[in-house]
Amino acid sequence: MSVSRLAASGLLLVSLLALALDGKPVEKWSPWLWPPRPRPPIPPLQQQKWLDPPIPQQQKWLDPPIPQQQKWLDPPIPQQQKWLNPPIPQQQKWLDPPIPQQQKWLNPPIPQQQKWLNPPIPQQQKWLNPPIPQQQKWLNPPIPQQQKWLDPPIPQQQKWLDPPIPQQQKWLDPPIPQQQKWLNPPIPQQQKWLDPPIPQQQKWLDPPIPQQQKWLNPPIPQQQKWQRPLQPEVPSLMELHQERQKQGRMMHHDEDPGDAAEGPRRQKKEPGKPEGNGCFGKKIDRINAGFGCPKLPPSGGH
């Protein structure tokens, strides 16, 4: 009986082992074999995976690779884009690029030995303004040498706008033209530093201030120097309010002052007993709080 059971369990183990292997060869290397056998070789890693991936073939036309000897310079211009900007020669890359032939009429080229400086100023014009080209002399005429430190001369066709001011009147007001003399009459010379006179139709508004008191305050009439000020000295509104508060704190509000015959008398109700109002049960008041009867007590609700 026991032998048959052992045989059955052995057959079961063999069948399970056959199912687990399922035609696979047994591995030759095992970590628990002794002596240890050499492990299988590890496949090499892809080198340069930490760099940029290679550029695909269909995108190599975007930016050409920079040669090793020119990586510190500007990248070379592709062949199909050389019509935009001509290439800069190697010996002039630190200078300004040469000006094309068709643009030399804009700005003349700077000499090679002076490209890093400013163009030289002629010796005889270093303290003056640069000369005006021939084709621009009609814009602004040149200023004569003897008048450069003065005001520029007035052109002939503009002399009718503002007449010149005479030398002896430059510190005064300019003269009034003849056609505008009817607008404002001229002010005499000895009154220009004073106040203008008050017209006749406005003399009833404010009397003129005397000349010797214009820089002072107006004089105080003699009959008011000894009088009291016009506004009487009354306590302020805040002082009156504080006085009423103090009087209210000192009074007994629970007592009736009464009259002269009967004297003060106290209130009828007891201070600790509330007054009944005839309400019973749970009723809702005016604000739906459920605190009692909606009608007010006889005292007014306070």
Swiss-Prot record:
Residues 33-44 have a biased composition (Pro residues). GO terms for biological process: regulation of blood pressure; vasodilation. GO terms for molecular function: peptidase inhibitor activity; toxin activity. Residues 24-47, 51-58, 62-69, 73-80, 84-91, 95-102, 106-113, 117-124, 128-135, 139-146, 150-157, 161-168, 172-179, 183-190, 194-201, 205-212, 216-223, 227-273, 294-302 form a propeptide. Residues 32-302 are annotated as: Disordered. It is found in: Secreted. One of its GO terms (cellular component) is extracellular region. The keyword Iron-sulfur does not apply. Residues 240-255, 262-273 have a biased composition (Basic and acidic residues). Expressed by the venom gland. Residues 1-23 form the signal peptide. Disulfide bonds join 279-293. The modification Pyrrolidone carboxylic acid is found at residues 48, 59, 70, 81, 92, 103, 114, 125, 136, 147, 158, 169, 180, 191, 202, 213, 224. It comes from the Eukaryota. Transmembrane segments: none annotated. Keywords: Cleavage on pair of basic residues, Disulfide bond, Hypotensive agent, Metalloenzyme inhibitor, Metalloprotease inhibitor, Protease inhibitor, Pyrrolidone carboxylic acid, Repeat, Secreted, Signal, Toxin, Vasoactive, Vasodilator. pEKW peptides may serve as metalloproteinase inhibitors during glandular storage. Their inhibition may be instantly disengaged, by dilution or physiochemical change, when venom is injected into tissue of the victim. In the C-terminal section; belongs to the natriuretic peptide family. This is Snake venom metalloprotease inhibitor 02A10. The gene is Svmpi-Cce12.
